[in-house]
Amino acid sequence: MFKKDLQGAPKQKLKSSAQRALRQSLLATYPLLTPHIEEILPKKGSLESMKLPDRNTLYVLDSVPLFYQNDGSDLLPHLKLVHRFPQAFPSIRIDRGAIRFVLSGATLMAPGLTSAGGRLPVDGGKPLEEGKEMEQGIVEDGRWSRELAKGEPVVIMAEGKEEACAVGTLAAGTDEVKAKGKGPVVEDAHFLGDGLWNLHTA
């Protein structure tokens, strides 16, 4: 999605009502951000939006990119936000062999997750339960503690690396990925070094 360098439009300050709506949407999608929300989106902060190509919008606070959105879909975290709060987002892990493909903007395929170096959520993990979101985070071995459904946002970690390398939306649920072991898993991801990562937001 952001393989090429980007030229963003001038930033526009969001109204207080729009900021409140985005804050609620962010917490609904990523409940584990709740303890950090005042740091990310302070109530008196000046959140700005920047229009990007292909109907994408980037949200910026004090020139720091926070999250982006494609044509009204779920808010997706910018990798710089993920690196600040890595355990607040659902994650999967690719093996070493898949890293160079993901960092070139290729579609993430299932074999990169089902191999020995890959990692998917805990087998049999329960779906997200309303009111119990805070209990469904990371377990001891670093796996996400619930299965993730098709269409959910996901952070992509990499074998042997501490920081996330990409963010995207699941083209298949994690239970399906385990069962089939093949096919596309994440398409059009935002990845380290892409146009969104390199975009000047000051």
Model-derived regions: residue spans:
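Polybasic, low-complexity RNA-engagement segments
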Residues: M1-A202
